[in-house]
């Protein structure tokens, strides 16, 4: 137990000093990401706010309903990023660092929300969490809900 506390303290110190490579190496060895069993309620509102920038209101409502009724499943971090045509954010991104601090403290992260659109998949909520997971282990499983079959405009 003391060994984990020392590793966590070293990781936090490395992170504070900006030595992100050392922090990442330490995290890979000592901290596995822990996930909530289901999506936090506020994440649905965040997903709908993001989707309102990309879709019309009817589609946003449809996506929200599909996301709320979808079951939690898992996909590898690299596959989520590849399907959404996104690159992972670096560990020094403020949102990724916030989630890394949560992981170091043992806090569970909320599953991700993904929608499939005619132009491909998109991460409606949880891009920072997927990026963190990818940076720690690109092939690690990330829990998510997927909404598909949205009405076309």
What are these regions (language model features)?
Residues 2, 23, 53, 67-70, ...:
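Short, intrinsically disordered low-complexity segments
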Residues 2-59:
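N-terminal extension/subdomain marker
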Residues 6-14, 18, 65-122, 135:
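Short alpha-helix boundary/capping and kink motifs at helix termini
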Residues 27, 109-153:
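A short, basic-hydrophobic beta/loop patch
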Residues 31, 39, 60, 72, ...:
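Extended aliphatic helical segments
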Residues 45-47, 56, 62, 67, ...:
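Generic alpha-helix signal with a bias toward terminal, lower-confidence helices
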Residues 53-58, 88-94, 147:
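Short, structured coil/loop segments at alpha-helix boundaries
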